[in-house]
């Protein structure tokens, strides 16, 4: 992973934010609700970011995450058209583990979420906004319930019958839907 990937994942884990610019704001003591600088927020912001970085860099966590990704069929990095999808999946993995979710739930939800992101294209365009919205919902109602709601609303019969087949008709060699099919 690049340093940008590391900062993005740590930001999602520590602050539930997808934009890199939010890291600077958090570490500067900016209160996201009031938009005022509060110096007393700085130590906690640094502690949260450090904790996220330590979890992210733990070899055990990274290898466990790679095992989950490979069990979903993604055995080669060339099967990914979006590093942002992988970043979100790793952040989700770390968040669920920190929340005490069982290994079987983490494995299932992370696999399904990764495939859903790649099939629907949620990791392209203004993905930071979608990721932040998803992270907020995960904090409020849990990852499994949030995923089930997203699957129900986005992976409809119309998606499978019309949207996905039309996305598969592409001459691009980095078509995310086709690469997901290969996985």
Model-derived features: positions:
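Polyanionic (Asp/Glu-rich) segments that form extended negatively charged tracts
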Residues: 1-98
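Short secondary-structure subsegments characteristic of cysteine-rich extracellular domains
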Residues: 103-118
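Short, solvent-exposed secondary-structure capping/transition elements
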Residues: 98-106, 122-124
């Amino acid at each position: 992973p690049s340093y940008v990937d590391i900062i993005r994942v740590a930001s999602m884990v520590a602050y539930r934010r997808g934009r890199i610019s939010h890291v600077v704001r958090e570490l500067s003591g900016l209160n996201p609700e009031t938009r005022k600088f509060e110096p007393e927020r700085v130590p906690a912001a640094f502690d949260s970011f450090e904790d996220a970085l330590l979890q992210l860099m733990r070899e055990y966590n990274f290898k466990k995450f790679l095992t989950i990704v490979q069990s979903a069929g993604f055995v080669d990095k060339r099967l990914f058209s979006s590093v942002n999808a992988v970043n979100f999946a790793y952040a989700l993995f770390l968040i669920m583990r920190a929340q005490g979710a069982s290994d079987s739930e983490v494995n299932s939800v992370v696999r399904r979420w990764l495939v859903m992101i790649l099939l629907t294209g949620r990791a392209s365009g203004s993905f930071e906004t979608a990721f932040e919205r998803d992270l907020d919902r995960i904090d409020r109602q849990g990852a499994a319930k949030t995923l089930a709601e997203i699957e129900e609303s986005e992976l409809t019969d119309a998606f499978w019958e019309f949207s996905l087949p039309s996305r598969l008709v592409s001459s691009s060699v980095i078509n995310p839907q086709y690469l997901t099919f290969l996985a």
